[in-house]
Amino acid sequence: MKAKLAEVVEIFTDGACKGNPGVGGWGALLQYNGHRRELFGGEKMTTNNRMELLAVIRALEALTKPCEVRLHTDSLYVQKGISEWIHAWKKRDWRTADKKPVKNDDLWRELDLLTQRHKIEWLWVRGHSGHDGNEYADMLANRGVQTALRGVSAN
């Protein structure tokens, strides 16, 4: 029997990369019952897609119990990857249709495990279009870039 889910947690995630590959950052804004939590981090050498995935992973890891989640991302790579492509990748032992290894499979596997704990609605939003939650996540991702540039570990 599944545990009773808490009320809906709204999560907004974004990734940023200065060069691709290059220095990158991720950010996540979690909102629940009037509370907010901001998460961000960065890496010195990464890709935009890794940062988009890491934003989602770190946000879901921050949830302390099974939750109903509305997850907003401006990354079609993340949204389609988790909603459509992952099922075929798993059937093909983490290979694409043309038999090449799935890029970022380490993060996709981690995300796949995390999604099993929660009921998640995956929502795509257009980036840089004035959506408050997405704009805030973008600001956090850029803060992550700055921490990576300074060599400071983030939260």
UniProtKB/Swiss-Prot annotation:
It comes from the Bacteria. Residues 5-146 form the RNase H type-1 domain. Mg(2+) 1 binds at residues 14, 52, 74. Coiled coil: none annotated. Binds 1 Mg(2+) ion per subunit. May bind a second metal ion at a regulatory site, or after substrate binding. Its EC number is 3.1.26.4. It is found in: Cytoplasm. GO terms for biological process: DNA replication, removal of RNA primer. The keyword Nuclease applies. One of its GO terms (molecular function) is magnesium ion binding. Keywords: Cytoplasm, Endonuclease, Hydrolase, Magnesium, Metal-binding, Nuclease. It catalyses: Endonucleolytic cleavage to 5'-phosphomonoester. Belongs to the RNase H family. Monomer. This is Ribonuclease H. It comes from Nitrosospira multiformis (strain ATCC 25196 / NCIMB 11849 / C 71).
